[in-house]
Amino acid sequence: MNLKDYIRSIPDYPKKGILFRDITTLIKDADAFEECINQIIERSKNYKIDKIAAIESRGFVFASAVSYLLKKPFIMFRKKNKLPAETHSVDFELEYGTATIEVHKDSIDKDDSVLIIDDLIATGGTAEAAAKLVEMSNAKIAAFVFAINLFDLGGSDNLVKKGYKVENLMDFPGH
């Protein structure tokens, strides 16, 4: 099964000049979604994994299924002020401004090896912020797994250059 066949491309969304890669067409097809989860697990099996983390919100769709099947704890990286307990937080740059993601301080233990899953990587700013949250807990990144890599935007390559392991299921141009 070619997962790329299940990704809808929407031009000029959310703004002119952007070609949006829509995963909803993949996750609404049970067989395609199952194949995607199986591919994430296959790409992850060579890494030591203590916990699985995901970036809000579409990353949760994939990571919670993987976490369940691998019987590993699931950690949520959330937008600012969405978690009720004490958090670590990281600010990062977006195209137009800054954003903040957080994780509960008690979610990740020292020396944990954390697999980070997200639906898509573009420039990699959010992924780098997630890595910082893991490292603030004195834990390490097992690897990143992205369903979609917008290869011409360079995020995946930037993570590799910083020494992280990266697995991409599908490559698309970002424009």
From Swiss-Prot:
Listed GO CC annotations: cytoplasm
Reactions listed under catalytic activity: AMP + diphosphate = 5-phospho-alpha-D-ribose 1-diphosphate + adenine
Alphabetical keyword list: Cytoplasm, Glycosyltransferase, Purine salvage, Transferase
Enzyme Commission number(s) of this protein: 2.4.2.7
GO MF, one example: AMP binding
Principal location listed in the UniProt entry: cytoplasm
CDD domains: PRTases_typeI
InterPro entries referenced in this protein's UniProt entry, alphabetically: Ade_phspho_trans, PRibTrfase_dom, PRTase-like, UPRTase/APRTase
Places the protein is found: Cytoplasm
Domain of life the protein comes from: Bacteria
Pathways involved: Purine metabolism; AMP biosynthesis via salvage pathway; AMP from adenine: step 1/1
Single GO biological process annotation from the record: AMP salvage
Gene3D superfamilies in UniProt: 3.40.50.2020
Subunit (UniProt): Homodimer.
Family of this protein: Belongs to the purine/pyrimidine phosphoribosyltransferase family.
PANTHER family tied to this protein: ADENINE PHOSPHORIBOSYLTRANSFERASE
Function: Catalyzes a salvage reaction resulting in the formation of AMP, that is energically less costly than de novo synthesis.
Protein name: Adenine phosphoribosyltransferase
Source organism (scientific name): Pelagibacter ubique (strain HTCC1062)
